[in-house]
């Protein structure tokens, strides 16, 4: 592929907004003017559907829900006064609570001022807050944030070890919309045990962020937790960053949540425009559509040339892949939509997978993210009368040019600096692009049925494990093969899973399962020792 580049084409397709401090350059995507003309009618329909969505239409038909993350930064757009007031009151409560913590009016049980925040959640309830907490962290932060976002026991131990003796001064936020998410429940129970082993009352350090009336909400009220903040059924986890899910921890950290909300609100205003060339969200979605030909399957490599945006790729990975990775369209037809997102940061990635991008399969497009401001204050010159920041930009421009020469497509998003406002802009920009792309290809971007399949299968694996342990304990000292165990518990069709579960059981001490290693390994025998008489 020969990519057409010229100063004229660059100027023709450059989106620039001085107030947003945002530039979007799509000129190195090899689309034609006819492409935009051909998509004009589908885009008009998409704009109409977006209007209906923001007015409260059931944009998530499979779950019968409205989609209202746009209302979080502009409550006056909410379809009812009740929703608008709930959003406004929740934000006020968040800011009031943060002020009480910062002032010391609200302290831990032993009079310890809170200095740390520990967030426990999974998926969208953690990825967004963690990204922004890292992107906007500074030496002026009022509290230090820690995160437990996985069910890995060793990972939990590592986080708690880093907190160490600061646990009495650590406020714990438990985030779960339903209150029944297994990973979050397990994380909460692990953390609760840590507080109790330290002689501390967990409820005196705990805050719930959950849907009203959920299991978690009821638990927090029963035990008298410090506070509970709401999640709403019209906000999905991956778009919940600007609700209490993200705003509470960020306000506690000392981050400018007003700036974050304003940036998102202002960007939303631009991405509502029905003029496609004046709408950065529409342009971004159209480039995805062009690259995938509306069929999905293409890879998006995200390269932010800024350490503060390193976690942005992980955030986008969930936002885009969980939203757009769908087997069926809205008509029930099999389409297997999706865009694979990966990346880390420039210029590190130039020394990892750039080789393949330049000479391997042409099955991707690159999204460069450029930040113009290098640092607070001035920089020293390295060599060639150039600062390290100037070298970093040169690496971005050089990589982009090399890709173009090899016929590999890219687009570039530029912001002036990383601050709360521009982070809000970026979040809103990609949220809108996801919505528009989903409308163009006719899929539901707001559910995740396959994730539920995985949860169901995990529950079945736990039940299978329990059946294995029960079988072995009924026959102490008797050595069973995998086949014999599977036969005994009626799971002959799942011998591989039985074997995998047994390997884990024998590596950990809790159930007392032992292995007499066989050759080959799957021929091993398993047993539980009986009592020593």
From Swiss-Prot:
Q: Which domain of life is it from?
A: Bacteria
Asked if Isomerase is a keyword of the record, the answer is yes
* Known pathway: Carbohydrate biosynthesis; gluconeogenesis; Carbohydrate degradation; glycolysis; D-glyceraldehyde 3-phosphate and glycerone phosphate from D-glucose: step 2/4
Give the GO terms filed under biological process for this record: gluconeogenesis; glucose 6-phosphate metabolic process; glycolytic process
Q: Its Enzyme Commission number?
A: 5.3.1.9
As for what it does, the entry says: Catalyzes the reversible isomerization of glucose-6-phosphate to fructose-6-phosphate.
> What name does this protein carry?
Glucose-6-phosphate isomerase
- Species assigned in the record: Desulfitobacterium hafniense (strain DSM 10664 / DCB-2)
